[in-house]
């Protein structure tokens, strides 16, 4: 199960990224985090930007409200969703079509 934490009223959760994949998608749970496959290579912050865009679509919030708070140069990251509580984010994720959730 994906663990959500709250930091100053914003949802924060862990992500495991697999860059240079055939498609960009949320694959499912990875321990206490979400596994994400990204088409972008981890060069010039392209994979991080694509990761943020993917979560902005999934949670229906603007790109500017999704940020990587730790692990920008790592495959394991923490992502913050501004304006969504941990419970709201958990509910959206539960109602999504992502396998294994």
Swiss-Prot record:
InterPro entries in the cross-refs: DUF167, YggU-like_sf
Annotated Gene Ontology cellular component terms: cytoplasm
Family annotation (Pfam families): DUF167
Family: Belongs to the UPF0235 family.
HAMAP family given in the database record: UPF0235 (MF_00634)
Protein name as catalogued: UPF0235 protein Plut_0338
Organism: Chlorobium luteolum (strain DSM 273 / BCRC 81028 / 2530) (Pelodictyon luteolum)
